[in-house]
């Protein structure tokens, strides 16, 4: 087996945990955004002793988190280069891509022009057209849908267009065909959504249930990522949480679904107990979905503290030749205006038991530096973007 600096690299993306406005925040209407800083203020101090040990407060002062005199990890921050601040853009950039055209989000629903085209091409009416929880919108509009056959169209804070239909009203093959039409229409730059999702359900009013026949029509990454290179070289790429959806299954050797952040940490612990060579890639989405978009700083703070409390289990299972990297994909400051993501730096923590000490890493000008470091470690084809910091980890 080749002599890799690290046999296993565990990447943990704390979805939306930004660490202060990016230099180009003004272009995104995000001046003053500071996800971690503002949560810490609202909580009157965050209790994250394990992240403190890793050096989190050395990146930026955070209320309640002391700057440990001798941090155990290398620490720094990364700036997003791509033109966007959504989950797909952040993750694709982490794995070596540069995204010029941002994916669209529709916090006020989709434009009439798009929906009229969809109606015309499907022969069905449309109801809903707003951001909503998938179960709540069925309670609200399921009965009307059953009477009229109109499609329930809704979105979320992410770049998605979801179409819900009762399996006895709109047969599955028709719903899938409708979603394929929607996918085609939204390849137009002005409607460019990351995913179309078919959301079939069954049951009666008051007792609707979504079925397992969900189908995603995602965009595949437009170029090869570091994950493709690892997989082609026979290495393991273990996706945990929504990672597989984000990359539309590209470059992934196995995928573990998660129900929550804590379930994600359980799956990470399980993965730490297995023998593999390659990467494990975990996304913890609750920070973003449950607290950031809902502008709930206290809930967000508690979730951060719960995450921190799970880290000793991870530390205990790390081997000498493992590397743990903790970062984020964008910000989502819960005290910022609106409900959207925020353009921020993201933290970068790199920890291994074999590190002699720790030090500050230079600020990365692109998230792709992380992907380049992974590629460098596994001696595979380097991405077009990004500069490896592997040699700095000693």
Swiss-Prot record:
GO annotations of cellular component type: cytosol
Binding-site positions, Mn(2+) 1: 15, 329-330
Cofactor binding description: Binds 2 manganese ions.
Any one Gene Ontology molecular-function term assigned to this protein's record: manganese ion binding
Binding site for Mn(2+) 2: 288, 293, 341
Catalytic activity as recorded in UniProt: 2-deoxy-alpha-D-ribose 1-phosphate = 2-deoxy-D-ribose 5-phosphate; alpha-D-ribose 1-phosphate = D-ribose 5-phosphate
Enzyme class: isomerase
EC number: 5.4.2.7
UniProt entry keywords in alphabetical sequence: Cytoplasm, Isomerase, Manganese, Metal-binding
Family: Belongs to the phosphopentomutase family.
Function recorded in the entry: Isomerase that catalyzes the conversion of deoxy-ribose 1-phosphate (dRib-1-P) and ribose 1-phosphate (Rib-1-P) to deoxy-ribose 5-phosphate (dRib-5-P) and ribose 5-phosphate (Rib-5-P), respectively.
Classification via HAMAP family: Phosphopentomut
Record's protein name: Phosphopentomutase
Source species of the chain: Bacillus pumilus (strain SAFR-032)
């Amino acid at each position: 087996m080749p002599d890799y600096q690290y046999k296993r690299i565990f990447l943990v993306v704390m979805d939306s945990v930004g660490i202060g406005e990016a230099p180009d925040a003004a272009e995104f209407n995000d001046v003053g955004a500071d996800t971690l800083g503002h949560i810490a203020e609202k909580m009157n101090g965050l209790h994250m002793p394990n992240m403190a040990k890793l050096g989190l407060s050395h990146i930026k002062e955070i209320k309640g988190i002391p700057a440990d005199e001798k941090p155990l990890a290398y620490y720094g921050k990364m700036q997003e280069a791509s033109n966007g601040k959504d989950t797909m853009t952040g993750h694709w950039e982490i794995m070596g891509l540069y995204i010029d055209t941002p994916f669209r989000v529709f916090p006020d629903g989709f434009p009439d022009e798009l929906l009229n085209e969809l109606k015309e091409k499907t022969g069905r009416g449309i109801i809903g057209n707003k951001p909503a929880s998938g179960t709540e919108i069925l309670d609200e509009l399921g009965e009307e849908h059953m009477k009229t056959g109109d499609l329930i169209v809704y979105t979320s804070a992410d770049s998605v267009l979801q179409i819900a239909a009762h399996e006895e009203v709109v047969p599955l093959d028709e719903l899938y065909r409708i979603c394929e039409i929607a996918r085609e229409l939204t390849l137009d730059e002005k409607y460019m959504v990351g995913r179309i999702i078919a959301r079939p359900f069954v049951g009666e009013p008051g007792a609707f249930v979504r079925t397992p026949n969900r189908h995603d029509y995602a965009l595949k990454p437009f170029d090869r990522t570091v994950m493709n290179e690892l997989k082609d070289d026979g290495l393991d790429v273990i996706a945990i949480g929504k990672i597989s959806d984000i990359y539309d299954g590209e470059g992934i050797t196995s995928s573990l679904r998660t129900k929550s952040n804590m379930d994600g940490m359980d799956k990470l612990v399980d993965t730490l107990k297995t023998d593999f060579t390659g990467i494990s890639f975990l996304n913890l989405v609750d920070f973003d979905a449950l607290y950031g978009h809902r502008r709930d700083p206290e809930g967000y703070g508690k979730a951060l503290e719960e995450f921190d409390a799970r880290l000793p289990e991870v530390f205990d299972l790390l081997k000498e030749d493992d590397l743990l990297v903790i970062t984020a994909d964008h910000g989502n400051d819960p005290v910022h205006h609106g409900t959207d993501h925020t353009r921020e730096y993201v933290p970068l923590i790199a920890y291994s038991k074999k590190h002699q000490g720790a030090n500050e890493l230079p600020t990365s000008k692109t998230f792709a530096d992380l992907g380049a470091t992974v590629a460098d470690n596994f001696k595979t084809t380097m991405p077009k973007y990004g500069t490896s910091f592997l040699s700095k980890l000693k």
